[in-house]
């Protein structure tokens, strides 16, 4: 059995590669259903955000990499060769460590950002809803979420952290010198847009207009911050009015095209500043070649992030120290997973003997209900103490790669075939 992650992130590939393998929620569900039907991949979780697409699996053998990347390439309509070039592949302890680092935001573009923990939780929830998880990934993702929460609570890694929307607003401020009195157009009304509007308001933007495919959502977001809703159908006019345009719809097609930007610039004297934080991108890259238009995509934000990374180095180091023992603990559990049926067999066998012998003894005694319960408790305690050592030995041997079969355990560890002890209770005469 193999735990593995095949992934592509801002660390391994540029945005133009990442957007080709990004999944909308409905597409993610469809891909999980397809994986569920694949032989040799009993468990899978798909994590797709603006900065990463990662597939976590439990597979039967190392060749799973070829199969998984082939399925991913076919589903996304990309060349398998490009996936091999741009993806990373981690297995077993390194796959576990990677997920823990992702959940703790150590692998994020913005170290300490808060969104990733919720995104990991949502990805795991979707996989469970699609019946794609089992004992291994259930435990892995539960522990990953606990690690992420602990890191945030105990290291302060999220204190004064910069979310992607925060960085976008900061970059706009650096370009204009000040955002006081500026007009902003925000495309999209999701969580990223809400965070972005908040940061723009905090920096003094005078007018914010919000456009979304669903006008009602744009109106709700605008009402929260004293902005105004706009229609995407009026985009040419809205572009001409705005100083700053930030887009985060991730619709999968160009929301802002070159001719629209060129037309908007003809009716104004000042330049137009555009930030595209969507993956897939919303703004046609040809806009970069238009005089007076300044376009930044999500990869361009990395420079701003790096200037603010030093403040979080100490917290990140503390987080890494938490992750190491957590990886060891998970791998120790995993190494004993294959002997769980054996341990259950031993416990069940001992419990059958206990019940039989206690029942036989109680029939010969005249005890009150309280006294009978005391005998039951005593017998359970004796059995648990007798089994503790052998079960610990089984787990230790399994962890060392030396699992014992059922017969050998009975003979060498439990000695259940000793004088006067029967593995299966005899019938009463």
Curated annotation (Swiss-Prot):
Task: Write one Pfam family the protein is assigned to.
Answer: Shikimate_DH
Keyword Oxidoreductase assigned to the entry: answer is yes
> Catalysed reaction(s)?
(S)-4-amino-5-oxopentanoate + tRNA(Glu) + NADP(+) = L-glutamyl-tRNA(Glu) + NADPH + H(+)
Q: Which residues bind substrate?
A: 49-52, 108, 113-115, 119
Q: Does the keyword Oxidoreductase apply?
A: yes
Listed GO biological process terms: protoporphyrinogen IX biosynthetic process from glutamate
Q: What is its EC number?
A: 1.2.1.70
The written remark on domains in the entry is: Possesses an unusual extended V-shaped dimeric structure with each monomer consisting of three distinct domains arranged along a curved 'spinal' alpha-helix. The N-terminal catalytic domain specifically recognizes the glutamate moiety of the substrate. The second domain is the NADPH-binding domain, and the third C-terminal domain is responsible for dimerization.
Q: What is this protein called?
A: Glutamyl-tRNA reductase
- Source organism per entry reads Rubrobacter xylanophilus (strain DSM 9941 / JCM 11954 / NBRC 16129 / PRD-1)
């Amino acid at each position: 059995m193999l735990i593995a992650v095949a992934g592509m992130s801002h660390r391994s590939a540029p945005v133009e590669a990442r957007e080709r393998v990004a999944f909308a929620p409905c597409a993610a569900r469809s891909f999980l259903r397809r994986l569920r039907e694949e032989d040799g991949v009993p468990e899978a979780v798909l994590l797709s955000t603006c900065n990463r697409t990662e597939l976590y699996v439990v597979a039967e053998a190392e060749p799973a990499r070829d199969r998984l990347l082939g399925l991913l390439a076919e589903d996304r309509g990309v060349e398998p060769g490009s996936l091999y070039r741009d993806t990373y592949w981690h297995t077993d302890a390194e796959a576990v460590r990677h997920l823990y680092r992702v959940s703790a935001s150590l692998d994020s573009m913005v170290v300490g950002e808060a969104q990733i923990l919720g995104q990991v939780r949502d990805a795991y929830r979707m996989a469970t809803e699609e019946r794609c998880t089992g004992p291994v990934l259930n435990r892995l993702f539960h522990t990953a979420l606990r690690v992420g929460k602990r890191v945030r609570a105990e290291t302060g890694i999220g204190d004064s952290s910069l979310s992607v929307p925060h960085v976008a607003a900061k970059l706009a401020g650096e370009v204009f010198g000040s955002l006081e009195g500026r007009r902003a157009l925000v495309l999209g009304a999701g969580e990223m847009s809400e965070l972005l509007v908040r940061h723009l308001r905090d920096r003094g933007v005078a007018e914010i207009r919000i456009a979304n495919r669903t006008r009602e959502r744009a109106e709700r977001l605008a009402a929260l911050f004293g902005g105004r809703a706009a229609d995407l159908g009026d985009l040419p006019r809205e572009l001409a009015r705005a100083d700053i345009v930030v887009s985060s719809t991730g619709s999968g097609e160009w929301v802002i095209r070159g001719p629209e930007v060129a037309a908007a610039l003809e009716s104004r004297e000042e330049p137009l500043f555009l930030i595209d934080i969507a993956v897939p991108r919303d703004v046609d890259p040809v806009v970069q070649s238009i005089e007076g238009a300044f376009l930044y995509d999500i990869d361009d934000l990395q420079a701003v992030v790096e200037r603010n990374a030093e403040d979080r180095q100490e917290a990140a180091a503390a987080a890494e120290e938490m992750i190491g023992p957590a990886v060891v603990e998970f791998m120790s559990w995993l190494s004993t997973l294959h002997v769980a049926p054996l341990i259950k067999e031993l416990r069940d066998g001992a419990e059958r003997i206990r019940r039989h012998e206690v029942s036989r003894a109680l029939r010969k005694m005249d005890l009150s209900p309280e006294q009978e319960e005391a005998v039951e408790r005593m017998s359970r305690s004796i059995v648990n103490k007798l089994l503790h050592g052998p079960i610990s030995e089984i787990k230790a041997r399994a962890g060392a790669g030396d699992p014992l079969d059922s017969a050998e355990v009975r003979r060498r560890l439990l000695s259940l075939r000793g004088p006067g002890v029967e593995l299966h209770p005899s019938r009463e005469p």
